Amino acid sequence: MMKIDLNADLGEGCGNDALLMPLISSANIACGFHAGDAQTMRESVRLALAHGVAMGAHPGFADRENFGRTAMQLPPETIYAETLYQIGALAAIARAEGGRLAHVKPHGMLYNQAAKDAALADAIAQAVKDFDASLILVGLAGSELIRAGARYRLATREEVFADRGYLADGALVPRSEPGALIEDDDEAVSRTLMMVQEGRVRSRDGAWAAVNAQTVCLHGDGAHALAFARRLREAFDARQIQVSA
């Protein structure tokens, strides 16, 4: 049976967390910089533990006003320290609740910049390794962040997005450009199944882009995120694709 991890970014104040949690296998929990706070982190940890969902830190830029989605030019030393800080905060809460972290996935523009910037990606990978070398580093399939994880001898998990458009080189279409979001549910499900089963996706310009789909991201902040999550789970179940971290 084919297996796929299904993850969502939670603890960001979007209100769907309790309903999304039973549908996913991994939760990326906001660590207080781009969203969330100590209380939401604790609530998210408890929800994940209650549903047997793998927990991961979701560090981002300290940019609440823009939800961590605006580019920031910070030195690698700052990226390292802020990543370490956020992982440590969530790990402490998880430990106090009787759990432990399984992975780290950067958020928003930190994620996007690390996909292309080797120095930034190295800073994140170094922080993960120095905190706990057993943690899985999650990044965009084929990106610099995945290569950084390999350089630092971390386990990595290559990610694809159910509702995002792709460029021919496997990068995501920037949110500011046409085709960034796949808004038709049928198309999004079909594209996701193709990425998981065939390892390819049709890019914005019509070319095929190769992707290694080890985990699929569901965005929890969309208006119909819950309904789409259920549809995608049904599609996986119908094809005997096991959802598991």
From Swiss-Prot:
It comes from the Bacteria. Pfam families: LamB_YcsF. Belongs to the LamB/PxpA family. The keyword Nucleotide-binding applies. InterPro entries: Glyco_hydro/deAcase_b/a-brl, LamB/YcsF/PxpA-like. It catalyses: 5-oxo-L-proline + ATP + 2 H2O = L-glutamate + ADP + phosphate + H(+). Signal peptide: none annotated. Catalyzes the cleavage of 5-oxoproline to form L-glutamate coupled to the hydrolysis of ATP to ADP and inorganic phosphate. GO terms for biological process: carbohydrate metabolic process. This is 5-oxoprolinase subunit A. GO terms for molecular function: 5-oxoprolinase (ATP-hydrolyzing) activity; ATP binding. It comes from Cronobacter sakazakii (strain ATCC BAA-894) (Enterobacter sakazakii). Keywords: ATP-binding, Hydrolase, Nucleotide-binding. It is an enzyme of class 3 (hydrolase). Its EC number is 3.5.2.9. The keyword Hydrolase applies.
